[in-house]
Amino acid sequence: MLIGDIMTRNVHLVRPEETLHYAAGLMAQWDIAFLPVADASGLVGTLTDRDIILRAVAPGLDAGTTKVSDIMTSNITYCYDDEEVDGVLENMKALQLRRLAVLDRQERLAGVVSRTDFTRHGI
């Protein structure tokens, strides 16, 4: 089975210039904890609810003025939609990741895969 068979395809994005307040609002509205960050050139980072808590709330940054780009993870770990699920799951476990951005072979965002996706498919 391939990652493309189990990943979530309709992914919500946030732009790096948006505020954390805006990004957190999207997370609340869509009940998600992970947002890929993209600009006109493509995927430039990721933002999680944990990033917001540890890198913004705990140090007292203002969510209304702090930009997503200020705290996002820009060293992106990802997989491809045509990779086998077993290998990707092993990599996620080794790196202690809950979610991964999924790219197609043209380096475009194709979706997101989470540990929940594996469980939902009995993997």
Task: Give each language-model segment a name.
Residues 53-66, 118-123:
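A short, polar/charged loop-to-alpha-helix boundary motif
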Residues 27-30, 35-51, 92, 100-116:
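A glycine-centered beta-loop-beta connector
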Residues 6, 26, 55-56, 71, ...:
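Amphipathic alpha-helical segments that mediate coupling or scaffolding at interfaces
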Residues 4, 12, 21, 53-54, ...:
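Nucleotide phosphate-binding site architecture
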Residues 13-31, 38, 79-96, 103-104, ...:
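The conserved cystathionine-beta-synthase
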Residues 1, 18, 47, 66, ...:
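Short beta-to-alpha loop/turn elements within the nucleotide-binding domains of ABC transporters
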Residues 1-11, 65-76:
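Bateman (tandem CBS) regulatory domains
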